[in-house]
């Protein structure tokens, strides 16, 4: 009787075991594919100032210089691939491309040091424990901190922002929702040095952003413009979204990710509530397609949403997906699922759906195509008429990160993120 009961229970567990095995194979196949694509890209990416970013009209890889906001994603992708393969050649390439960015540790001209340094040197330190990398990261955190202003309670994003409504309207203390992503560098610096000033800067910025960047339903504004003298909000606008009052898809993705990460680092329940609210808003939108890959803005062409007169969104009817937003959101939701109890299944299931969509032929390029980038159909900025329906290096990075997080959950049921 005991044998029969045991056999019956074993039969019950077979479907779950098969599904888990199939999902592990799915992750493995995609990581093997990533290794092939990145190996091909390494042949084309030559020179110290040619960090892969997107493709040109002929479908060839286009690089950018180190002081752009995106150079950290390519070496970060190499590190994720090395982590999976253990390939020493990939580690050598990751090391080389990372160390090219060392001068950025002293860069103070914009806020993106988190993307630039933490995606590259952060992964490098995580996988090698090289003390020199830690020192570079701490110095980068010091450089980022110079852009914090106590009057606004924020880290200044760009040095100025020109409104899409009026070319004469220029704001001198813009803060964009993307900036939440750079706080991880500050939290890291406090963790490894014990200097709480980085932590205080990060949570002050997070609190100010939570107060001013969100509507009551947890949808986000893209750009908040502060008066640098009084610290008060002057305007709530968009740079890359459809309209000032719309919700730019990648901006909402940054928000979900940023507050999930901030909860991880602080364990403050306000940030968890915020991250869940932002994720719930995202997933419940009627404009979100069934494959969970959003259009570039959740409110394009909807009544009550009007682009600024200078924005290219005024003169185009393009309805395009932004696969980069889905990649970022998938990675964030895998993490958020681990903090959310019973709600976690909703977030994990959505992340799995996004990941499978991105890995489908609709979004994942054939080997050797797409300029050797992995993910197709991304949008940089329609208002600026740039990078429209192209691959983007950060879509690949967060696709890889989401795969790694899913792999950890399949193997261990939990994430190891520090």
Model-derived segments and spans:
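Bacterial Sec-dependent N-terminal signal peptides
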Residues: 1-25
């Amino acid at each position: 009787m005991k044998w029969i009961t045991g056999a019956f229970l074993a039969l019950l567990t077979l479907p779950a075991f098969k599904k888990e095995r199939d999902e592990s194979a799915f992750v493995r196949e995609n990581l093997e594919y990533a290794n092939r694509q990145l190996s091909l890209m390494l042949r084309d990416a030559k020179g110290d100032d040619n960090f892969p970013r997107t493709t040109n009209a002929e479908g060839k890889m286009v690089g950018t210089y180190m002081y752009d906001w995106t150079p950290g994603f390519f070496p970060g992708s190499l590190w994720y691939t090395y982590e999976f393969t253990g390939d020493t050649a990939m580690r050598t390439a990751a090391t080389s491309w990372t160390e090219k960015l060392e001068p950025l540790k002293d860069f103070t001209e914009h806020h993106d040091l988190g993307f630039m340094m933490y995606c590259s040197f952060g992964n490098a330190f995580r996988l090698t424990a090289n003390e020199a990398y830690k020192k570079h990261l701490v110095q980068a955190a010091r450089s980022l901190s110079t852009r914090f202003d106590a009057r606004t309670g924020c880290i200044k994003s760009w040095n100025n922002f020109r409104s899409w409504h009026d070319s004469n309207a220029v704001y001198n203390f813009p803060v964009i929702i993307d900036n939440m992503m750079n706080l991880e560098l500050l939290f890291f610096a406090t963790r490894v040095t014990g200097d709480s000033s980085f932590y205080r800067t990060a949570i002050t910025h997070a609190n100010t952003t939570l107060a001013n960047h969100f509507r009551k339903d947890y949808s986000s504004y893209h750009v908040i413009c502060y008066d640098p003298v009084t610290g008060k909000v002057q305007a709530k606008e968009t740079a890359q979204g459809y309209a000032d009052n719309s919700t730019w898809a990648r901006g909402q993705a940054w928000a979900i990710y940023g507050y999930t990460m901030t909860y991880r680092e602080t364990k403050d329940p306000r940030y968890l509530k915020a991250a869940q609210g932002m994720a719930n808003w995202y997933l419940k939108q009627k404009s979100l397609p069934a494959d969970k890959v959003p259009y570039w803005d959740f409110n394009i062409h909807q009544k009550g949403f009007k682009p600024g007169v200078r924005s290219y969104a005024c003169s185009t009817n393009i309805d395009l997906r932004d696969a980069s937003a889905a990649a970022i959101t998938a990675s964030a939701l895998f993490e958020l699922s681990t903090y959310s109890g019973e709600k976690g299944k909703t977030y994990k299931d959505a992340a799995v759906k996004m990941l499978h969509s991105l890995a489908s032929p609709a979004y994942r390029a054939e080997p050797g195509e797409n300029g050797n980038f992995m993910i197709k159909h991304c949008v940089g900025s329609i208002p600026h008429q740039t990078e429209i329906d192209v691959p983007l290096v950060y879509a690949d990075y967060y696709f890889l990160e989401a795969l790694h997080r899913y792999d950890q959950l399949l193997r261990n049921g939990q994430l190891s993120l520090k």
